[in-house]
């Protein structure tokens, strides 16, 4: 073997060096955030019982053992993944309550930016939790705390919490028909009529 051949065999691969140099450094905070983001998507796309920590870790590009290290297991990871999943406060602070029915109905009909990008889906969490003994009560409590109670505070007046729950019922039903079931009756041709009809019912709840 010539010295030239030895050099060729032992010379480092420049592409490998480039990959190492350009690979972003990953600290504990970044790893934790990646796991949490992957979990939010997984739990909204499949039932809790069907989601494994290995699946989440693979989506996040980390070792499965890190899920337990940072979150203490799947149950605690799920609880953290649904924090702020249904939060209404930031979206409606200062909103014109005389147009609330129209605004929120239009938002539900059009879908959120996250849904359009096929990322986290709060509706998916709600629907899947309804058939899951492991998560039903926790998701219900989270939805009540993050959506129903803050909305009731916006509504004020008599039976505000009941009215907020009725509004939530309208919205969940509408979102299920439109986005989960893809009903052709709620397609583009009839969307405006649907918004007008449902928003009127919601506005009646707002006005008390």
What would you call each of these model-derived segments?
Residues 1-58, 72-76:
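Basic, helix-initiating cap at the start of DNA-binding domains
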Residues 60-71:
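Short hydrophobic/aromatic patch on the recognition helix
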Residues 78-85:
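Alpha-helical DNA-contacting segments of helix-turn-helix folds
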Residues 82, 113-144:
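Amphipathic alpha-helical segments used for helix-helix packing
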Residues 90-123:
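Hydrophobic alpha-helical connector segments
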Residues 98-103, 107, 198-208:
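N-terminal hydrophobic signal/anchor transmembrane helix of membrane proteins
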Residues 108, 123-130, 167-175:
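Short alpha-helical scaffolding segments that buttress acidic/His motifs in well-ordered protein cores
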Residues 136-141, 151-205:
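Hydrophobic/aromatic-rich alpha-helical bundle segments in the mid-to-C-terminal region
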């Amino acid at each position: 073997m010539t010295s030239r051949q030895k050099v060729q065999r032992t010379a480092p691969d420049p592409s490998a060096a480039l990959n190492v140099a350009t690979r972003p450094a990953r600290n504990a905070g970044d790893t934790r955030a990646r796991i949490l983001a992957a979990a939010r998507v997984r739990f909204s796309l499949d039932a809790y019982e069907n989601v494994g920590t290995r699946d989440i870790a693979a989506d996040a590009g980390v070792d499965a053992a890190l899920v337990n290290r940072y979150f203490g297991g799947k149950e605690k990871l799920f609880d953290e993944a649904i924090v702020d999943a249904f939060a209404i406060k930031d979206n409606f602070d200062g909103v014109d309550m005389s147009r609330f029915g129209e605004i929120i109905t239009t938002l539900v009909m059009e879908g959120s930016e996250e849904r359009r990008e096929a990322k986290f889906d709060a509706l998916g969490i709600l629907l899947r939790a309804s058939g899951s003994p492991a998560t039903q009560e926790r998701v219900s409590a989270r939805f009540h705390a993050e959506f129903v109670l803050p909305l009731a505070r916006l509504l004020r007046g008599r039976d505000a919490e009941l009215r907020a729950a009725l509004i939530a019922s309208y919205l969940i039903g509408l979102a299920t028909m439109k986005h989960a079931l893809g009903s052709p009756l709620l397609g583009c041709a009839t969307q405006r009529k649907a918004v007008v009809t449902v928003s009127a019912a919601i506005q009646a709840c707002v006005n008390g």
